[in-house]
Amino acid sequence: MALSTNNNSSHVGADDFLELENILSSEYNEEGIFKTSKTVCIRTDKRIGVGFLTPNDMISRLVGFINRKAEDAGVRSVESFRQISDVVLIIVPQIALPAELSLKLVDSANILEAVNDQEVTVNSTGGPCVVVMNCAHSIPNEDRTHVNGSEVHRRLGIQYQVDCDNISGRVTTFSITALWREAFSFRPSFYKVSDPLVVPISVGFRKAVIAKSHADLQRSIGRGLIVTHHSSESSVTSESPIDLTVKKSTGLKIRDKSEDDNQRKHPVPLTSSNNKLKTLRVSTTPIVNGRSTSTSE
């Protein structure tokens, strides 16, 4: 936003009305800026990129615009600041290849350096994780910087860099959900902060649904095998052929046909240990008046 100023006064120009029109528009959009819709899913589909955090709703953007213009015009006698803290990034890998993601919390005044060493590196092989960053200073609302040739108010953002081999083009390597806190204050703030915190997210194993149904599994195997023009003769190789048998108690089991032949040739005798039938014993002692009496003479 271009702004003509001198020591005594400042005026509102055409660029100011253009910025206000964009803020009031429901289709508010700035190239390289993370809007509310983008905070749902930030896709790292480039090798390197940066996106700046904006207020979450149009009212906050409008209030910030009014505060900045009031300061520029000399209406306010005090400065105002935006305090951004507790930047939470939920990172989920989107490829099944090793990829390294480097993140920095940056200021639009200098997007090359991390703010207070707030930088971290995660790997896709580690699975999803949560990265928590913080900011140790507030940003004056009057400050302006240039983004893509346009003058906008100074803001914080997330810079990412992806290092991954064997991929080309615009491939999404990670998806990032960004959340943060933003507060308005008339006083500047400065806090000491700790290093970024990385919290891994434990996930369960995905089991094939078709493996739970033996009938569906058999049908899938049948559809996946070409059995036409095949003879039913036994295999002539030294390896014994295998077949798929379904057992209600044990489920799907791969059995060797030689085991069945061996059981037919050498049947296992039925012993008391493997006999499942139980003998019902009947007592012959009569019961008289609730007491048992012996029948022996």
From Swiss-Prot:
GO cellular component: host cell plasmodesma
Role played: Transports viral genome to neighboring plant cells directly through plasmosdesmata, without any budding. The movement protein allows efficient cell to cell propagation, by bypassing the host cell wall barrier.
Protein name: Putative movement protein
Organism annotation: Citrus leprosis virus C (isolate Citrus sinesis/Brazil/Cordeiropolis/2003) (CiLV-C)
Disordered as annotated region, ranges: 249-297
UniProt biased composition (Basic and acidic residues): 253-264
BP terms from Gene Ontology: transport of virus in host, cell to cell
Extent of Polar residues compositional bias: 270-297
Protein's cellular compartments: Host cell junction, Host plasmodesma
Pfam family for this entry, one: 3A
InterPro entries: MPV (IPR000603)
Keywords: Host cell junction, Transport, Viral movement protein
